[in-house]
UniProtKB/Swiss-Prot annotation:
Phylogenetic lineage: Eukaryota, Metazoa, Chordata, Craniata, Vertebrata
Skewed-composition ranges (Acidic residues): 312-323
GO cellular component: CAK-ERCC2 complex; cyclin-dependent protein kinase holoenzyme complex; male germ cell nucleus; nucleoplasm; nucleus; transcription factor TFIIH core complex; transcription factor TFIIH holo complex; transcription factor TFIIK complex
GO molecular function list: cyclin-dependent protein serine/threonine kinase regulator activity; kinase activity
Job description of the protein: Regulates CDK7, the catalytic subunit of the CDK-activating kinase (CAK) enzymatic complex. CAK activates the cyclin-associated kinases CDK1, CDK2, CDK4 and CDK6 by threonine phosphorylation. CAK complexed to the core-TFIIH basal transcription factor activates RNA polymerase II by serine phosphorylation of the repetitive C-terminal domain (CTD) of its large subunit (POLR2A), allowing its escape from the promoter and elongation of the transcripts. Involved in cell cycle control and in RNA transcription by RNA polymerase II. Its expression and activity are constant throughout the cell cycle.
Residues annotated as transmembrane: none
Region described as Disordered: spans on this chain: 297-323
Keyword Ion transport found: no
Example GO BP: regulation of G1/S transition of mitotic cell cycle
Identification of the protein by name: Cyclin-H
Length: 323
């Protein structure tokens, strides 16, 4: 259960400010490592600022969701949610300048398939990359190389509680204990849209799965012009606990505000930041502190050592077959 989980104890935070501090600290720690190797100065413009890292994380998180949405065989929502949570957690304590988000996002999806027991083979997984067989083999090698690192950086807390199960539970509860609403299924589509949008925010790191699920349902009801105050007060027995009800309403308002204020990264900005990111991962700077036998995922234009044939490196454009 969530309330006894590592997610509640270690990965649910008190505020957006706390998340910002963790990310800024990860950025600072990497800068210190990079300066210590003597190749850059403390204020070198090669470094990404914390807000620039966040923009890139938003971009790659969206790419992760797009990759999962067209995955074949169809990926269950719980697996997608788990992969998304892994990605968010990883970059709370790590910098994109040290670990490239392109390979981390794929490793998150790969690990989520295993943990959530979505039976897909390694060749099937990389087969979803728009790449040659050699390129797919290269991608799989990189994923396997980073899998243990990801597990370690998640502190071996691999079980993720997503809002999808409580969401279905609330719909069942509405059907059985709230006859005022004749057909609760009319709320599903808009609520699903809300869940998709809130997955792009930090809500998973701030609120419980049941709070997110309930907010999705009530937001859907509100958009449909359906009042559900009596469901909260009577069915959820919050009538006598006005403090708890008030806190719940405040939480829901905060979540809706998260969705409203979310701004997708602009393509022009992302293009500039990706150039800075690739420079951080370039061989001449070698800011990545684990540059052991790299296969070139850091550079979109990388071509592996040529012998009898040339092998083309996979890039961001190879992540999905179609968007």
């Amino acid at each position: 259960m969530y309330h006894n989980s590592s997610q509640k104890r270690h990965w649910t935070f008190s505020s957006e400010e706390q998340l910002a501090r963790l990310r800024a600290d990860a950025n600072r720690k990497f800068r210190c490592k990079a300066v210590a190797n003597g190749k850059v100065l403390p204020n070198d413009p090669v470094f990404l600022e914390p807000h620039e890292e966040m923009t890139l994380c938003k971009y790659y998180e969206k790419r992760l969701l797009e990759f999962c949405s067209v995955f074949k065989p169809a990926m269950p929502r719980s697996v997608v949610g788990t992969a998304c949570m892994y990605f968010k957690r990883f970059y709370l304590n790590n910098s994109v300048m040290e670990y490239h988000p392109r390979i981390i996002m794929l490793t998150c999806a790969f690990l989520a398939c295993k943990v959530d027991e979505f039976n897909v083979s390694s060749p099937q997984f990389v087969g979803n990359l728009r790449e040659s067989p050699l390129g797919q083999e290269k991608a799989l090698e990189q994923i396997l190389e980073y899998e243990l690192l990801l597990i370690q950086q998640l502190n071996f807390h691999l079980i993720v509680h997503n809002p999808y199960r409580p969401f279905e539970g609330f719909l069942i509860d509405l059907k059985t204990r709230y006859p005022i609403l004749e057909n609760p299924e009319i709320l599903r589509k808009t609520a699903d849209d809300f869940l998709n949008r809130i997955a792009l925010t930090d809500a998973y790191l701030l609120y419980t799965p049941s709070q997110i699920a309930l907010t999705a349902i009530l937001s859907s009801a509100s958009r449909a012009g359906i009042t559900m105050e009596s469901y909260l007060s009577e069915s959820l027995m919050l009538k006598e606990n006005r403090t708890c009800l008030s806190q719940l309403l405040d939480i829901m308002k905060s979540m809706r505000n998260l969705v409203k204020k979310y701004e997708p990264p602009r393509s022009e900005e992302v293009a500039v930041l990706k150039q800075k990111l690739e420079r951080c991962h370039s061989a001449e700077l070698a800011l990545n502190v684990i540059t052991k036998k790299r296969k070139g995922y850091e550079d979109d234009d990388y071509v592996s050592k040529k012998s009898k044939h040339e092998e083309e490196e996979w890039t961001d454009d190879d992540l999905v077959e179609s968007l």
